[in-house]
């Protein structure tokens, strides 16, 4: 699920300065040379209006050129695609009324220029030996690949534990669905775990972007762990969305779940109300019946359009489980072969779900 536009700009900038990129190589050279730098990652009329002095270059970017130009006083201005060095030794004069929380002259200028122009700005501190990125209204210190990888591996271990627990509660929910014993608590617990897993995965995805070429193995592990999770998240909401004004609007519910605070996400009652359930303190113990989206999605080679038609026709999973081949054939797009496949698929799923729970 896409985040706010500022998050997209932030991630794109992290990718541009990730380890393994020519630009990051240039920044590392500046750090190793124990010099500072102020670099604007973009050029337009607004940036030009803030520039005084210096000289125009308009030459192809290279890490060595960036390192040599950083030895001079003044800022360096790059093209938006970081392919060319536009100006060097420039004195930047941003609006002094633009608010900044920084104290050092270079960092104050960097933050103000970033806010005033909308372009990312890099400040390399000679004394603190850090690279600070100012973009989309935030300040972010770039760490080395080893530090990022350490945090990423911790997050990945957490994701593995949460995914294991998710598989357990999802399996329990499937068995309860077959027996028609589902309560609001059972369904909401799965939605809660799915959202928690998604948030941890989002954090790891940021590390993958920040690691650049060093994040390939991490990306493969993340992809394997998250296979089918987003689909399961949507189908669970569609299965249990109460009939009414919100019925069919699963996308809105998913967006509201994504926007929940970490504290609210721990409260099953709050999640239940976001999904659309109403009632008193006993709301979580109310018995409910799924529509059958989750179970039908596990039947091999069953198109989504046919799944929607089956759910519209039978309305609940219990009616689907009780339907014979002839009943299934009454649905548009379901011939005899597909009807038998659905019937056999549901029977196998019912049997395996019960066995997993009780054996």
UniProtKB/Swiss-Prot annotation:
Pfam families xrefs: DAC (PF02457), DisA-linker (PF10635)
Q: What are the BP-aspect GO terms?
A: DNA repair
UniProt-listed Gene3D superfamilies: 5' to 3' exonuclease, C-terminal subdomain, DNA integrity scanning linker region, DNA integrity scanning protein, DisA, N-terminal domain
- Known catalytic reactions: 2 ATP = 3',3'-c-di-AMP + 2 diphosphate
Binding of ATP: at which residues?
A: 74, 92, 105-109
- The UniProt record lists the EC number as 2.7.7.85
Leading EC class: transferase
> DAC domain location, by residue?
7-145
Tell me its cofactors: Mg(2+)
Q: Which InterPro entries match?
A: DisA, DisA_sf, DNA_integrity_DisA_N_sf, DNA_integrity_scan_DisA_link, DNA_integrity_scan_DisA_N, DNA_integrity_scanning_protein, RuvA_2-like
A GO molecular function term, named singly, is: adenylate cyclase activity
Query: Which keywords are on file for this protein?
Result: ATP-binding, DNA damage, DNA repair, DNA-binding, Magnesium, Nucleotide-binding, Nucleotidyltransferase, Transferase
- Keyword DNA damage present in the record's keywords: the answer is yes
Output the superkingdom of the source species. Bacteria
* Subunit text: Homooctamer.
Q: Which family does it belong to?
A: Belongs to the DisA family.
Q: Which PANTHER family match?
A: DIADENYLATE CYCLASE, DNA INTEGRITY SCANNING PROTEIN DISA
Purpose of the protein: Participates in a DNA-damage check-point that is active prior to asymmetric division when DNA is damaged. DisA forms globular foci that rapidly scan along the chromosomes during sporulation, searching for lesions. When a lesion is present, DisA pauses at the lesion site. This triggers a cellular response that culminates in a temporary block in sporulation initiation. Also has diadenylate cyclase activity, catalyzing the condensation of 2 ATP molecules into cyclic di-AMP (c-di-AMP). c-di-AMP acts as a signaling molecule that couples DNA integrity with progression of sporulation. The rise in c-di-AMP level generated by DisA while scanning the chromosome, operates as a positive signal that advances sporulation; upon encountering a lesion, the DisA focus arrests at the damaged site and halts c-di-AMP synthesis.
- This one is known as DNA integrity scanning protein DisA
Source organism per entry reads Parafrankia sp. (strain EAN1pec)
């Amino acid at each position: 699920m896409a985040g706010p536009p500022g998050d997209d700009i932030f991630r794109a900038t992290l990718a541009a300065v990730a380890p393994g990129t020519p630009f990051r190589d240039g920044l590392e050279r500046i750090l190793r040379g124990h010099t500072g730098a102020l670099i604007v990652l973009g050029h337009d009329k607004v940036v030009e209006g803030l520039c005084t002095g210096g000289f125009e270059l308009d030459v192809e970017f290279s890490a060595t050129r960036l390192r040599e130009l950083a030895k001079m006083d003044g800022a360096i201005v790059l093209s938006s695609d970081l392919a060319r060095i536009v100006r060097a030794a420039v004195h930047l004069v941003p609006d002094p009324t633009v608010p900044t929380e920084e104290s050092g002259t270079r960092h104050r200028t960097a933050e103000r220029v970033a806010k005033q122009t909308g372009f990312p700005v890099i400040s390399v501190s000679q004394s603190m030996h850090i690279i600070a990125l100012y973009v989309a209204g935030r300040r972010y210190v770039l760490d080395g690949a080893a530090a990022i990888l350490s945090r990423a591996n911790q997050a990945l271990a957490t994701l593995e534990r949460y995914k294991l627990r998710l598989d357990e509660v999802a399996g329990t929910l499937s068995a309860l669905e077959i027996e028609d014993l589902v309560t609001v608590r059972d369904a909401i617990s799965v939605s809660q775990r799915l959202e928690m897993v998604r948030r941890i995965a989002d954090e790891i995805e940021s590390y993958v972007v920040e690691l650049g070429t060093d994040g390939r193995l991490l990306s493969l592990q993340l992809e394997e762990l998250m296979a089918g999770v987003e689909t399961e998240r949507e189908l669970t909401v569609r299965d249990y969305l109460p009939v009414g004004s919100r019925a069919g609007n699963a996308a809105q519910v998913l967006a509201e779940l994504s926007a929940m605070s970490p504290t609210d996400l721990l409260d099953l009652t709050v999640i239940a109300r976001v999904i659309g359930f109403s009632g008193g303190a006993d709301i979580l113990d109310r018995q409910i019946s799924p529509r059958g989206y989750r179970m039908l999605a596990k039947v091999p080679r069953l198109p989504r359009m046919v799944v929607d038609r089956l759910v519209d026709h039978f309305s609940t999973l219990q009616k689907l489980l009780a339907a014979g081949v002839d009943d299934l054939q009454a649905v548009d797009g379901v011939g005899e072969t597909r009807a038998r496949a659905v019937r056999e698929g549901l029977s196998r799923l019912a049997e395996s779900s019960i066995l997993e729970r009780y054996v």
